[in-house]
Amino acid sequence: MARWATMSTETTGTGARDEGPRPGDPADSPFVRACRRKPGPHTPVWFMRQAGRSLPEYRKIRASVAMLESCRRPELITEITLQPVRRHGVDAAILFSDIVVPVAAAGVALDIVPGTGPVVNDPVTTAADVDRIRPISREDVPYVDEAVRMLVGELGATPLIGFAGAPFTLASYLIEGGPSRNHTKTKALMYGDPDLWHALASRLAEVTLAFLKVQIDAGVSAVQLFDSWAGALSEADYRRYVQPHSQAVLAGLADAGVPRIHFGVGTGELLAAMGEAGADVVGVDWRTPLDVATRRVGSERAVQGNLDPCLLFAPWPVIEAEVRRVLAQGRAAPGHIFNLGHGVLPETDPDVLTRVVALIHELTARPNARS
């Protein structure tokens, strides 16, 4: 596969795409075509957390570099992002970063602790804490801008996905001080001081939007908004406290010319509301069949998902049967991007992922489907 032809500088850093895609343009790739509900030569596949601890080459690079530091070094971001594309032949790369990178750039003191995740030094409890979260621009995250431009040149026709954390999930980290099982402090603030909650979520929406615009201006072909913890909410609470802020982010990208993917874990009952927030593609975890998800999000949106990450530890005949099932259910959607229902687990055998990619490409080959 010719994945490494360098693109001309005329195709990088253009922001909104006004011209139609040309042959070899990532905008005409199977991934972007599926996002736009257009036919393509096969069902595209990539994996959340495909650049990560399942790869020995990733573990080697990260052995002596802290997580947050690795997210601030363009040469490391570039190499780590490329690793799964080289190894697996996936249809899209996703920028290596972490959802707390933009809030750190906005002045929040935090670290990413091995085995724990993001830990915030001074959790948000007051309006003064919210006021200390400053706006960001390209100058605050130059390493992201540089890495995206490098990657677009390296990837050629393979699209690069940019990403950011959604306001609710970021707010939960900032309020709880780190990962939380029940999000008790987050919900207490949300219910008890809704004005403060909306002020925080609105500020984080501004930071997230700015972070995604940096990536789009540098040349990413799509973006994904991760709302990892949204499944902790009822639909009523989601619509009241969360949807307006995710909608602000996605609406701010409406004229950017790239597909917008919206994903959360445990959000089967929220899929319609997440789609209504402004997504072109709604990510689905493994709990909800894709044909059911398609009915919930409607015919105006593609779906992404949704193999259970744990199934990759099963015998190959079981994996193959489940891949076939997901593909069959995905045919109910106007566009389907194959993915896992959450991130690749660290213990996953990378050879199994490579085999899954090859199987999907073989089973869905449609050489004359492009139109």
UniProtKB/Swiss-Prot annotation:
Gene3D superfamilies: 3.20.20.210. Transmembrane segments: none annotated. It catalyses: uroporphyrinogen III + 4 H(+) = coproporphyrinogen III + 4 CO2. It comes from the Bacteria. Pathway: Porphyrin-containing compound metabolism; protoporphyrin-IX biosynthesis; coproporphyrinogen-III from 5-aminolevulinate: step 4/4. GO terms for biological process: protoporphyrinogen IX biosynthetic process. It is found in: Cytoplasm. Residues 1-14 have a biased composition (Polar residues). One of its GO terms (molecular function) is uroporphyrinogen decarboxylase activity. NCBIfam families: hemE. HAMAP family: URO_D. This is Uroporphyrinogen decarboxylase. The lineage of its organism: Bacteria, Bacillati, Actinomycetota, Actinomycetes, Micromonosporales. The gene is hemE.
